[in-house]
Amino acid sequence: MKTTNKKELSYFRLKLESYLSEHFPEKVEDKPFIKARADEALTTYCDSVEEGFSYPEAESMASEVLYRDLHFSKYDTLVSVLENEFEKELPSPLPERLAPILLKNRAIQETFDKYNLTDDFDASPEYDTLYTELTGTVVLLIEANQLPTIGDVSALE
């Protein structure tokens, strides 16, 4: 049984690490968080099976625990802004590469900090306001730092 638990723990850890690398690259190196969340998901899975839930039901419950508070992604939001609003200036794969760098920028952080970012934030009316503010912040960062882009940034004005 010990081998099974270790395999399941590895499954939840790998599942979480994969998700984080795609949506929360800033959390990929947070090993204590990953271990704690994977352990909690494993416990939920085992307890659910023990309580009589089917394996798919237990998997679903464990996934809820695994991804708790990880549905709204600053990274995904910023990539979306860069892809949609700066398509000509920052062609793929630049948005995915630039987003982690921009997430460390104080102006970008301050923009996100104005909002209560819950799991369902992207369905709220405030999301559009955040999106617009992020677009403006990126324009200001490009102009203030005279960052090179492909195409003409002044066309945005």
Predicted segments, located by residue:
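C-terminal alpha-helical interaction appendages
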Residues: 1-157
